[in-house]
Curated annotation (Swiss-Prot):
The modification Phosphoserine is found at S97. It comes from Human immunodeficiency virus type 2 subtype A (isolate CAM2). Belongs to the lentiviruses Tat family. This is Protein Tat. Residues 70-80 are annotated as: Core. Pfam families: Tat (PF00539). Residues 1-12 have a biased composition (Basic and acidic residues).
Length: 133
């Protein structure tokens, strides 16, 4: 039988693992240091100016090649052509302003039947055999 006065022994393995550094903690320290270095590298790349890249491929690998490729190919953002926007000539602007006085519905309603009427008139003239012959 067990005596109530005898103290229970604590497992020695649990005490040893708490007091002594194990190989797990040293491995975790190494991975955290690597992650810290990687984070610093990413931040340094973030603040670098974008370099010109002449890669014209749009595959997934090339889209993530560098930050410029990601912006241009992956997201479709291109900052190169700000001043090359086509402008309408002044004559076209004057013509469009007179057309804008009419409502859109009247313009579309009037323009389509006029074309159909012209076609039907031409068709009837061609099919008429003429008078008295």
């Amino acid at each position: 039988m067990l005596d109530m006065e005898t103290p229970l022994k604590e497992p020695e393995s649990s005490l040893g693992s708490c007091n002594e550094p194990s190989s797990r903690t040293s491995g975790q320290d190494a991975t955290t240091q690597e992650l810290a270095k990687l984070g610093e590298e990413i931040l340094s790349q973030l603040y670098q100016p974008l370099e010109e890249c002449d890669n014209s491929c749009y595959c997934k690998r090339c889209c993530y090649h560098c930050q410029l490729c990601f912006l241009k190919k992956g997201l479709g953002i291109c900052y190169d052509r700000k001043g090359r926007r086509r402008r309408t000539p002044k004559k076209a602007k004057a013509h469009s302003s007179s057309a804008s006085d009419k409502s859109i519905s009247t313009r579309t309603r009037n323009s389509q039947p006029a074309k159909k009427q012209k076609k039907t008139l031409e068709a009837t003239v061609e099919t008429d055999p003429g008078l008295g012959r």
